[in-house]
């Protein structure tokens, strides 16, 4: 019995001693909380840790160097993850690098500064974009006409307008959708 416990303990520690990556799968059935997973990716970038975004691999999974704090944050937020060894990570990247496969590794290095084009006084649950960002725990600023006119958009890496679904819902309910002369989503 003692040998079995010692062998089990040894295998457990061996598994984690060679594990150096966290794989956050994004495929359906594997990821418990897709929005929170995006929030984890943003949080990691805020902490100056590079992420490899595996486009078209298991739903666009994220590959991150292993840190205990990242693993703990995944647990706290209810995000599914796998701890894998460098060898496994390299095998995944080899599969992705095949020119016959429509997949790619994109390195993410900086958390973008995000703004949402929405009027003051709107609550996060009033529009789908702010609701999603709030739930995912991704920080954003609200901007509206006065910020646009005063040329403050250059402070942001990403500007997202109100969701079209919200406009359709307003029309369905007999309300006037927000009126703007220009419809835009600006990626700076």
Q: What spans do the regions from the language model cover?
A:
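Short amphipathic alpha-helices in soluble, non-transmembrane regions
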Residues: 70-83
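N-terminal, post-signal-peptide region of Sec/Tat-exported proteins
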Residues: 34-73
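Bacterial N-terminal signal peptides that target proteins for export
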Residues: 1-6
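Non-catalytic propeptide/linker segments at domain boundaries
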Residues: 80-111
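Helical hinge/lid and interdomain linker segments adjacent to catalytic or ligand-binding clefts
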Residues: 22-32, 62-72, 115, 119-188
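N-terminal signal peptide c-region/cleavage motif recognized by signal peptidases
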Residues: 14-15
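Residue-level detector of anion-binding/catalytic polar loops
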Residues: 50, 80, 139
